[in-house]
């Protein structure tokens, strides 16, 4: 699509050529008419032109800078005898502001009363409709052809005239307001703008007649601090196209406030041949005016007036009105109550006042009267830290003392004042607070009181209209946090503000709480819509600098000047700010004592040390505990760290050093997540607004390590898009363990980088690391992700954020499931829940799954086994391999292969066969031997039995057997007890006679002496 300014540039050039041709065309027509009259002498005779029938114009400037003044009839052909052309003024000639060029005598004359001029300029201050020459265009940010359909959704997203100003769009479309002008000399363009919301990109730039933009130093507009601001840019001679362009980047439910522009003035244009009448509601009471004044309240004026007219008594008008309105009857919505300051008697008066400006009438039927004032009541006590003087005013107690609102008391020895501001009694507005009213119609401050004191609370008074912003501001010069807090670079809390409030509304009222740092634009922190019961809100302050806190209440957003809902109010009961520099104290807190020559004095404990209340000495917190730095009293101030975490050196936070252990009945699993310590990013699926703008939720995560330092950074660069590469600019950023931002990619925006906006912290502190699904009230449902299939439970990191919102009363929480996935190399992959593509299903609890091989347990001896090879060539190898599937990472390495000397199976086979053969032979020999031996013994035994039966023998019984044939006389037969095999062998070898026969001893049955036969 062509650049919008290009077509306007062309039209400007065409218009310039047309302007140069006009005088020549008129002269040609006049010459043709005269010639026609001469040739047609019989035609009707034309009268001489009167001054009212023609006007003067200049011809185009020639190369020498000269031009001619010519008379041009209003209607060609009606008259004749026009004045002859004469030499005109120099092309560079111009009149001053408040003057116009009288073309008759070519001199500057002052404007008459009721009129004004800018000299060589033009002004646009009426925006009931788009002025002539302006163009309003809209486009979708998508640059590709796929956005053609969504572009149609942006046709109505344009700049809208609203009477005194023109307002930009508030959606994600790009709206452009353009004006083309041809300058005869160098000039300026200046305008007023109201730019309160940084979620809109607002740029103003100028293109010259070569369609080249001028210097970009003033292109990107800065947000306005208070009300309207003035902006001016120099213009070069020639064609200039002015662009006011806005694009909103608020893709959530919050609708940003539009950019407003008014009073556009351009100088350096062609001469002004007449003065402009003052618009209704303004006047010029003297000649030579360069601007018109506004009519005061209760007066009006018509167009071109020299003075304003007073309204009738029964009518009223606001400042700059063109008419008067009838005063309505006064109601109870037209007045409010307040309290006077305490008098010398310690009493205050209840006062009723009409809301300003008073537009109602007390004389009409049914009108209410202002209630009687002057009822006296006793003054409430002073606020804590203040004391009451003799004239019943409240003054702050000196440093080193405290009070509950009565008398000041010195802090006891061993204590120090806890300085701050605690406002809970509202008899007068504190000196460091101010209140005003910002008009919801023209966004100008009215110098009125927006909040009124009412004893035990402060509330919103009645404004000029229901859409006015009732503003209350508290300014704190700085903070004085404890020394232990200042030493902790990761703990961002330097102080906190707590206030109790309620809203009572019948329509769509809104209460805004905003914070400004170093006088920068107030940033909305929280918004409450509709009626809210009495409740408390706490905001943590993270920067030690001058800070302003602002409460703004708007009864309705309807763009009308009416006062119908003044009974809709916001009330603030108390405001408490801690650790305020030069503040006051309502109590004294224990401190560490330091001995000196003059006694003992308070000193600060080192970081990570608590104060013993009894002795005033400093003691280090135990291991694995952190110190509550803002209340470091007693050992109970040391809070234990969660599972899987430990404290840092100064006991300010608990962190995980990227290690974890899980015990089971059979073994201990150790983890090391060091490979996952670096920050990683993850983008959710694309989302689209109602206008078709594509955006992503972009997450940045830092899991562990780094001594607990938060490494994830999310930024808001909406107002910093045009900073050149290599240069730094201001952009809001937050640091956390896990943060989220809304990203519009560069291919959509067309800028050098994608737009990052609305950064949010999701994890400010680590609660613990465990395999349990619930910890400290935070649950990580397993069903949000695909189930684990390896039998190794997920290790879950639990975090909490410090941000507390209406929808997340306990703050946001984040869980990161770290799952062992051996096939995914480092760093692995991050996943969002399948059912909640933005990481959360409720907006408060965010869940992530991180799968990686680095999430597996460390390898140990239980994760591998040995494989022994066969013996080859006398060598045997033992190889160690991982068990499959391998479910570990890192840890120990596999042992080296082990080589041993061995015997082959052939050798052992030969040895076995040889041993078997020998054994068989030996057994055979022994068997034969014993068989033969047994045969001999059997034979001898049978002989003895036979001899024992010979009872009829004549000879006396012999003690030995007879010598048989073939037997040796020397053989002895002895009956012995049973012998073993080896005993028999021994006997055999020892009794063998030299002749080869055995000697067997015999034993008689009577046990007598052995006898040799």
Swiss-Prot record:
Name the Gene Ontology biological process terms. Answer: autophagosome assembly; cellular response to starvation; positive regulation of autophagosome assembly; positive regulation of vacuole organization
The record's PROSITE patterns line, in alphabetical order, gives: MRH
Extracellular side residue ranges read 42-910
Which SMART domains would you find in this protein's record?
A: Ephrin_rec_like
Using the record, list the residue span of the signal peptide; answer none if the entry has no such feature: 1-41
Q: Which residues are glycosylated?
A: 153, 404, 672
Q: How does it sit in the membrane?
A: Single-pass type I membrane protein; Single-pass membrane protein
Major place of localization?
membrane
Query: What protein name applies here?
Result: Endosome/lysosome-associated apoptosis and autophagy regulator 1
């Amino acid at each position: 699509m062509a650049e919008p300014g290009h077509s306007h540039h062309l039209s400007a050039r065409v218009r310039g050529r047309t302007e140069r041709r006009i005088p020549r065309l008129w002269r040609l027509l006049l010459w043709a008419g005269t010639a026609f009259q001469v040739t047609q002498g019989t035609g009707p005779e034309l009268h001489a032109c009167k001054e009212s029938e023609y006007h003067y114009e200049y011809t185009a400037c020639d190369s020498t800078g000269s031009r001619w003044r010519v008379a041009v009839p209003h209607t060609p052909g009606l008259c004749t005898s026009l004045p002859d052309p004469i030499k005109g003024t120099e092309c560079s000639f111009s009149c001053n502001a408040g003057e116009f060029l009288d073309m008759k005598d070519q001199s500057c004359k002052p404007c008459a009363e009721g009129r004004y001029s800018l000299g060589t300029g033009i002004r646009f201050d009426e925006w009931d409709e788009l002025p002539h020459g302006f163009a309003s265009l809209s486009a979708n940010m998508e640059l590709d052809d796929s956005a053609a359909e969504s572009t149609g959704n942006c046709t109505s997203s344009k700049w809208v005239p609203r009477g005194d100003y023109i307002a930009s769009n508030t959606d994600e479309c790009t709206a452009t307001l353009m004006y083309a002008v041809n300058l005869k000399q160098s000039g300026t363009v200046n305008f007023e703008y109201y730019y309160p919301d940084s979620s809109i990109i607002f740029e103003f730039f100028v293109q010259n007649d070569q369609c080249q933009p001028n210097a970009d130093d003033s292109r990107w507009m800065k947000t306005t601090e208070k009300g309207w601001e003035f902006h001016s840019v120099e213009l070069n001679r020639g064609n200039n196209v002015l662009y006011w362009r806005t694009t909103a980047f608020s893709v959530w439910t919050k609708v940003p406030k539009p950019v407003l522009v008014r009073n556009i003035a351009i100088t350096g244009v062609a001469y002004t041949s007449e003065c402009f009448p003052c618009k209704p509601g303004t006047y010029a009471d003297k000649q030579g005016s360069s601007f018109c004044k506004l009519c005061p309240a209760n007066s009006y004026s018509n167009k071109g007036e020299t003075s304003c007219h007073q309204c009738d008594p029964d009518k009223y008008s606001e400042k700059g009105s063109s008419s008067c309105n009838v005063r309505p009857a006064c109601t109870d919505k037209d007045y409010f109550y307040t309290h006077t300051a305490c008098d010398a008697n310690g009493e205050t008066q209840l006062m009723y006042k009409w809301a300003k400006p008073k537009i109602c009438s007390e004389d009409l039927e049914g009108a209410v009267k202002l209630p009687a004032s002057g009822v006296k009541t006793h003054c409430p006590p002073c606020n804590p830290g203040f004391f009451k003087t003799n004239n019943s005013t409240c003054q702050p107690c000196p440093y080193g003392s405290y009070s509950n609102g009565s008398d000041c008391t010195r802090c006891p020895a061993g204590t120090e004042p806890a300085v701050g501001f605690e406002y809970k009694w509202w008899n007068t507005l504190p000196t460091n607070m101010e209140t005003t009213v910002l008009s919801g119609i023209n966004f100008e401050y009215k110098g009125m009181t927006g909040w009124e004191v009412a004893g035990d609370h402060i509330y919103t008074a009645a404004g000029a209209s229901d859409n006015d912003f009732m503003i209350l501001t508290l300014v704190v010069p700085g903070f004085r946090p404890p020394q232990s807090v200042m030493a902790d670079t990761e703990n961002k809390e330097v102080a906190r503000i707590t206030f109790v409030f309620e809203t009572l509304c019948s329509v769509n009222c809104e209460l805004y709480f905003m914070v400004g740092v170093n006088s920068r634009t107030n940033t909305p922190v929280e918004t409450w819509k509709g009626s809210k019961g009495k409740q408390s809100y706490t905001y943590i302050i993270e920067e030690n600098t001058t800070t302003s806190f602002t409460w703004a209440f708007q009864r309705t957003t309807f763009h009308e000047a009416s006062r119908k809902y003044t009974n809709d109010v916001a009330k603030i009961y108390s405001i408490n700010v801690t650790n305020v520099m030069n503040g006051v104290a309502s109590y004294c807190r224990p401190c560490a004592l330091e001995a000196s020559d003059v006694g003992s004095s308070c000193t600060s404990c080192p970081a990570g040390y608590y104060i013993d209340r009894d002795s005033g000495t400093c003691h280090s917190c135990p291991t694995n505990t952190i110190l509550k730095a803002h209340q470091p009293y007693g050992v109970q101030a040391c809070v234990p760290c969660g599972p899987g975490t430990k404290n840092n050196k100064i006991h300010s936070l608990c962190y995980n050093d990227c290690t974890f252990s899980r015990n089971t009945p059979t073994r201990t699993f150790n983890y090391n997540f060091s490979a996952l310590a670096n920050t990683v990013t993850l983008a959710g699926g694309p989302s689209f607004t109602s206008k078709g703008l594509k955006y992503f939720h972009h997450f940045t995560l830092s899991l562990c390590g780094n001594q607990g330092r938060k490494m994830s950074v999310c930024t808001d660069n909406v107002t910093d898009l045009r900073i050149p590469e290599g240069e730094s600019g201001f952009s809001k950023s937050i640091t956390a363990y896990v943060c989220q931002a809304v990203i519009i990619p560069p291919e959509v925006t067309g800028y050098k980088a994608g737009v990052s906006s609305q950064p949010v912290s999701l994890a400010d502190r680590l609660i613990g690391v465990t395999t349990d699904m619930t910890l400290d009230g935070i649950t990580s449902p397993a069903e949000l992700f695909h189930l684990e299939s390896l039998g190794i439970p997920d290790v879950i990191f639990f975090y909490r954020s410090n941000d507390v919102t209406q929808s997340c009363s306990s703050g946001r929480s984040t869980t990161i499931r770290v799952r062992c996935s051996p096939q995914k190399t480092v760093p692995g992959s991050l996943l969002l829940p399948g059912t909640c593509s933005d990481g959360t299903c409720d907006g408060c609890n965010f869940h992530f799954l991180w799968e990686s091989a680095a999430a597996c347990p460390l390898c140990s001896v239980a994760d591998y086994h040995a494989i022994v090879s066969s013996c080859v060539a006398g060598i045997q190898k033992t190889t160690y391999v991982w068990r499959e599937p391998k479910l570990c990472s890192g840890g120990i390495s596999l042992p080296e292969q082990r080589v041993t000397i061995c015997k082959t199976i052939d050798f052992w086979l030969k040895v076995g066969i040889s041993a078997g053969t020998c054994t068989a032979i030996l057994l055979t020999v022994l068997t034969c031997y014993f068989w033969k031996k047994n045969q001999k013994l059997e034979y001898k035994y049978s002989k003895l039995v036979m001899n024992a039966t010979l009872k009829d023998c004549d000879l006396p019984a012999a003690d030995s057997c007879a010598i048989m044939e073939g037997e040796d006389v020397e053989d002895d037969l002895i009956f012995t007890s049973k012998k073993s095999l080896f005993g028999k062998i021994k006997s055999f070898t020892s009794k063998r006679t030299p002749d080869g026969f055995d000697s067997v001893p015999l034993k008689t049955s009577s046990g007598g002496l052995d006898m040799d036969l």
